[in-house]
Structures are given as structure tokens and as C-alpha cells.
Amino acid sequence: MKSNIRVRFAPSPTGPLHIGGLRTALYNYLFAKKNNGVFILRIEDTDQSRYVSNAEEYITDALDWCNIPFDEGPGKNEKFGPYRQSERKELYREYVDILIEKDKAYYAFDTSEELNTHRKQHEAAGKTFIYNWHNREKGRLKNSLVLTKEETKKKIEEGSNYVIRFKSPQDETLVLNDEIRGVITIDSNTLDDKVLFKSDGMPTYHLANIVDDHLMKISHVIRGEEWLPSMPLHVLLYNAFGWETPNFAHLPLILKPEGKGKLSKRDGDKLGFPVFPLEYTNEQTSEVSTGYRESGYFPDALINMLSLLGWNPGTEQELFTLEGLISSFGLSRVSKSGARFSLDKTKWFNQQYLQKKTDEQLAELYLTVLKTKNIQRLPSIDYIKS
């Protein structure tokens, strides 16, 4: 175990926080607090085309409601800030230039139309087009590996659109270790040369993610299973920079109640239950999605339920306080396989917490619900308790 534990929850502000993302935040928080570490919130907003203006506020409100406070983040203890990637734009250019100088990255000028033509030609021949060592230097593609330095410089000065790609190694066997999934072996010849940076001055997720994790001294990257395919590239990037690699842990998916397929944001009210901690209003369509808070659920009940969706305490115990979760949690008991969501079990947890509440606590909660629903004439606490 590394001595200084620093973990991060790094959502993209593209909409409301899904309960799968909330569980990722929770596991990071529990791991940090169990090991006297630091829990960081970082907003990964490099994809401005998908940016939603009220999403960051929603994320922080949801974490507040669930009692998962971050130690560092936007507007709070900004020791390694800024914590929004859009505010770190100039920084990423410096680091991609380092990769170019080390011959670990290169300029590519291929248009979308040209790349589509290559894909169709490969498909016609029963093959799959991969932009990597197999074809990057054979003259079919337009990049700085086949162009002279003068030709490359001229294209950039003329304003030609470009991307900067990572130069994946050839004929290497990558041996990766995941805290949950164990040892993973990858043939580097199967990897494509991912885009790291674009001519509009914005990095892609991969570059920004690695640079920020390094500069923020992240010790453990605990994230969803959907990022497992990115792990080889991320480890290669750490190696290319000559940086120490953090420990990785990829959490299992939260599955739909029938056990088939990931429980997604789109499932929401369609399946008859919330998939967001708080109610969310889409600013463009005015569509309202229900939340657990507005549906009468207690935050501690929701957190208790989510903690057991993928983690096993090793006992028959099901009800945990937040302090109990912190003392019991460990990555060694997180499952590799997906965890099925159960609405009945979620209701059961809420009922257990309801029974524990005092009359005074219930009265306070009742008033909060009325205020949330903009009911103006509120009864007094004494009236409710009577």
C-alpha cells in the first residue's frame, strides 16, 4: 500500500450524476477515509460539445446530499488546482510537446473522409483498419512520421487541421495489474494510436486524465469497468513520461434488475424507479427525471444500498453507518462481475432507516420535502410532531 493515499472522482459535466457514478465516488471516498487519505473532485470538461451548464452544480449538490464531502476540488483547498480541466488547457500543450520531443507522439493530418475511406477499403478486404505501427509509416497516411520536418511545419503554419497521436509501441507484451481483476496481459500490436490533442487546443480525455492524475499525485485510480480498455494506453503514457504509475481498480457495472445490460441514465423513469440521486431538469427539453431525494429516500439508505452493489463485507451484516462502511471497506472484496440493481432491496433499506428515525428527525425531513416542492404555507415543527 502506498503511504500517501490520494484518490479522485472525475465526472464529466454532461448531465446528471448517475447512481453508478455516485457509487464510484462513494468507493473512492471510503477507500480514502479508510486509509487516512484525500478524496478529490475533478471536473473533466474537455469535451465542450457535450458540456451542460448546470451539471457541475448538480454533481456537487448530489455529493453534499449523500454526505460524501470532497477534501480538494473546485473552490475548496485548491492545492493542486485548478480542478476543472478547461482551466488547465495551456498545461496539456506543454506535456504533449514533451511526448513529441521524445518520439512518443506525432502529428497526423488525415481528414475524417480520408480515414473513412481507409476503413471501407479494409472492410472490403475483410480486415479492420487500425491507425498504428502497421500502417502509420507506409505512406498511405498523412502524418509527421512520413512527412519531413519542413512539410510538417508548413502544414501547421498554413492552419491545416491536425491531431497529435500517441505512438503505440510494436511487438511488446504489456503486463498490467488491476486491484480487482488481477493480472491482465495485452499485445501492444492490437492497440491503435489514440488521439491525445487536437488543433483547437483541447486535449482528449486520455492525455488530460494522465497529466492531471500525475500532477495531483493520485495514488489509486478507482473507476468504472468501462475504462478498463483505456488502461493499456494510460500505463503506456505513464511509461512514456517516465512517471510512477498509480494503482488501478476497475469497478463492476451496475446491471438492470433482470441482470442483462448496464443500468444507464436512459433507463431512469422508463423502468419505474430513479437512477439519479436528485431530481434533474433538462435545460434544453425541460424534461424532468425523478431523484431518490424527491422520491422520499434517505441519503444514508441510498449509500448503504449502493455500497453493497459490488462490494461484500464478508459477513451477513447489511446495515452500515457511514463510519461502519469506512472501517469495513476494502478493494479486495469488490467483485469482478456486475451487480444487479434491485428496487425491492432499495425500498427495504429505506424502510430500515425510516424505522430508526425519531419523530423530531421525521418532522424536519417532512418540512424539507415541503420546501423542496415550493409549498408556501408550512406547518410548525410542533404541529407536525403532534
Please provide the spans of the model-predicted regions:
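Active-site-adjacent bridging/hinge elements
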Residues: 2-5, 34, 207-210, 274-280
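N-terminal Rossmann-like or analogous alpha/beta NTP/dinucleotide-binding catalytic cores
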Residues: 2-128, 229-240, 301
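Acidic, glycine-rich active-site loops and adjacent beta-strand->loop/helix elements
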Residues: 43-49, 225-227, 252-255, 346
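A generic structural motif
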Residues: 45-47, 215, 222, 353
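Catalytic cores of large soluble enzymes that bind and process phosphate-bearing ligands
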Residues: 51, 84-88, 104-107, 168, ...
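Alpha-helix initiation and N-capping motif
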Residues: 56, 89, 93, 112-115, ...
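Active-site cores that bind ATP or allylic diphosphates and position pyrophosphate for catalysis
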Residues: 106-107, 111-267, 274, 288, ...
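Catalytic adenosine-cofactor/nucleotide-binding cores of aminoacyl-tRNA synthetases and other
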Residues: 241-386
